[in-house]
Amino acid sequence: MRSEATRAGETIVGGQVLYMALELSERTWKVLFASPAGRRRERSVAARDVAALLEEIAAAKRRLGLSAQARVVSCYEAGRDGFWLDRALRANGIDNLVVDSSSIEVARRARRAKTDRLDLVKLMGLLLRWVRGEAKVWSVVRVPDAQAEDIRQLSRSIERLKGEHGRHVTRIKALLATQGIKLARIGGRDWGKRVGELRRWDGSALGTWLQRDLVLEGERLAVVAGQLAALKAERDRLVAEGREAAAVKARELARLGAIASESSFVFATELFGWRTFSNRRQLAGSVGLTGTPYSSGESAREQGISKAGNKRMRTMLVEIAWCWLRYQPTSALSRWWQERFANTGGRARRIAIVALARKLLVALWRYLEHGIVPQGAKLKMRAAA
């Protein structure tokens, strides 16, 4: 796993530093270089041409009066290009930052100029402020290593296939509803035969093309169901036998009652399997569960959670919190929630479950990092060897 991102203010070494900001697009990358003396050089290279980018870096060092061994500090905004460029730059000795684009400050005018060049100049200005020690000018993205990013695709593929499966079922139900038909079971090996036997309200057979549409939709549903079953089996095998860091942590999480193998795998691959956290606030911030206070003059209120982090994890945490109340009723967390919110209304309970989710997240972190089982929680029996 790669080391943590360089801290603000740690990149200026003896004045021999080349700063580089990248504006990435589908066809062309715009590159802006700057030296500590304030000199600048702007160039363009073909997208994904790392060799050409390295040549421009060498040329910029010469033109800006820096030595060939000068350190290079670069940045680009996180987006569709992912993290491969970050790994390529670091493999060539460049200190790179991947920046959360939503954290970059923008003018609040009704209309503002927006061009790639203006964005590039803005990015360079923020980079220079960051290296001077202004850590809060933006948020730096934590980049997973290649293995952690790869194993994360498994849980995301399963989620994507679940969505496709649901859409096919909904489409079939909608087509049948237009004919006044409702079925308890959709799909199956005999789906084509069952479609041919369906009858409208007056006993007549379905139209030829409607039957064809239903059969084709059923075939697509069967393909997705098969792929989904195969990926789930692979996930369960990894959780049971895998030696990767994410698999080991998923296995430990699955020992807790109320957390199934599916949830534990998502927790491990998205959060605990590759990231490290210094404190509870940093942990809660990673999934958008930190508070957002508002205080101006005499007005002061809480605006709710920030929702600035991983949405998948935040959604799953709330689901797990409800499961925790059901399957871990004697735990300290469940008793805390029941004592305060059991007799409140529906809206208050929905708000309160987020508080439980935040406490549960911290408890799971302590369990994985320090082996501290949540107070009163029950563990599942280990399978016999």
Which residues fall in each region the model found?
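Short, basic/hydrophobic alpha-helical segments
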Residues: 50-73
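Short alpha-helix plus adjacent loop in nuclease-associated cores
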Residues: 97-140, 194-195, 299-308
